[in-house]
C-alpha cells in the first residue's frame, strides 16, 4: 500500500512551460508566483485509506507512519470523511503513527465527530489487523493506545484477540446501573426489555444528564441471557448514536454482569447487533478484574483514496 500523500497538480504555470528557471524579468516571476499559488490552491491531496470493521463497528484506517498526514487533518474534515452520506462513512478514524522515543506504534483515534477520543476496543482490533496487512507484524503485536499498552494476537479462528486495561473500580449506582472504565468510560444498565428500548433517545438522555454531561459517557443497555452470556446495545458518545458494536462497552458489560451476579464465569459470550464478541478475564475478587481480553472479527471492507482538499 502507498504510504503518505500523493499529489495531483492540474497544471504547470504557463510561464514555466518550455523553458528553464529562473525566469527573465520581474513581471515573469510575479506571474509565475501567482499561477503557482493558484495551482497549489487547487491541488488534490490524495490520502490512501482502508475501511475495516469489527462486528459492524467500522473505521477508516490511515497509514501515517511518516507523520505527514496527521498534522493536516482538521476536525471538520475527519467528521465529513466519517459522514455516511457525504464521506466514506464510519464510526471513527484511526491513524497508524510511530510512537515517540522509539516506543513502537501509536493508535491515534478520532470519533466520527472529528475529535480525538479515549481508547476504542474494536478499533484496536482493527488497528492490529491493518498493521498486519501493512506487514508491520506477523500476527502478534504490541502497540500504544491512549490508555496504555495493548497486545494483540490472531487466534486459531482467524479472529483478533486484544488485551484490555484492567478494572479495579466499579461504581454501583443501584442494582441495575454500574459505571466503570475499560479504556473509555461506560454506564452499564441491565434490563429484561432490551429490544423495546429506544437506544438513541434514552442513551442521549443519560449521556447528557447532569453527572455525565461535561465529559460524556457511553451507555450500554444489557440483557443477561444465561450465565456467561449477554446481549448488548450501545449508545456511543462522539458518534452520538447507537452503534452496531462497541468493544470497550462489550468488555464493560461483561465485567459488570459478572460483578452484579457474583458468578464464577470468567468467559462471556456477548451478542452485539453487528455480531458476536468474546470477553475473558480473571476475577481477583471484589472489583478487581485482570488479564482482560476482547476477541472477535476484524475485517477489511474496502480500500481507496480520499481528497484532503477539494479540487474545485
Please tell me what each predicted stretch does.
Residues 172-178, 303-308:
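Extended Gly/Ser/Thr-rich low-complexity repeat segments
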Residues 36-156, 188-312:
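A glycine-rich beta-to-alpha transition motif near the start of alpha/beta enzyme domains, typified by
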Residues 162-177, 201-205:
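Active-site glycine-rich loop that binds ribose-phosphate moieties when present
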Residues 12, 16, 20, 32-35, ...:
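Acidic, Ala/Val/Gly-enriched low-complexity intrinsically disordered segments
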Residues 4, 18, 25-28:
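Residue-identity detector for glycine
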